[in-house]
Amino acid sequence: MNNYKIRINFSHHYTRHILVALKTTGVDIEHDPNIKPEFIYVNDELVGYIAWWDSLKFTPANLKDMAENDFKIIFKFHYSPNVIDYSIYGKYEDRIVPCGLWRTWETEDINYKWNKHNIMTRPRPIDVTAQMRHINSSKNWYPWSHIRYQLKNLAKAMNDRGFNTSFKMIGRKAYEKKLLDTNTAFIWSATSYLGWKVCEFLEQGVIMITEPLGKDYPLCNDVVLEDDVHCVFCNDPNQFEAVAKQLLADPVRVNRIRKNILDLWQSKLTQNHVGRWYLKKIIETYEVMQSQMKNINKEKELMESI
């Protein structure tokens, strides 16, 4: 890996976590503000691009960059092939790599230490959290806004009925610590699908109750969340309380799912694993480019010799 120098300009806080993860690999990674934002170069050759915007489609800014350049790989946040037919993007359809919205508390807090045993065995006095944004800058509420608001109110009502729930937004550090005391979480997709919540819950061992995802929402490192393995699916917001009660009443099931979650994080989603995954995709793409160029040059030499 010493033969590669990677220059990137990940200009947004969404991608800061990926930059930090890449730097754990030991490869020569330079954050270069002099190249265009979101571009990825290997040995001074343009290889890839990262599309992090909150959209299942590519944005106008993405499309402009894609039209003006020939990226060989595009890392796409919020990739959802069952919602969007990506063949509309022509040559780029087979170059898109889904990568979800990944982050770790390690990037946010230098003092954070992930302790699997502690996370697995610690008391969790909070039954349910529903601390999620339910509106954005739009004046008109989207369907997801109403559902998220409904779930937040449901958590509040459960609190009034004797459950210990969290539903008010709080500061990031307080939220991080509170997740460690939380058993389950209500979450529903928004404009940007599930966003950061997935990794926040997985890293802290919180069991998501969410609408069905399946292969419609692949995360980075080829991770696909499975029902009753890593989370619990429910397609009816009106049934979330019943699902939570059933789950909380079954500690064996809770422990099984939590162990699966933490095993998944440890084996696929740590900083180092994610960094190596991104690096592998980038380097493999670069090597294919080099091989293709060698073949082109050989054909040219052959034609010139005839």
Enumerate the predicted regions with their spans.
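Short beta->alpha junction loops/turns
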Residues: 191, 236-237
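Catalytic phosphate/metal-binding cores of nucleic-acid and nucleotide-processing enzymes, i.e., regions
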Residues: 206, 216, 237-240, 261
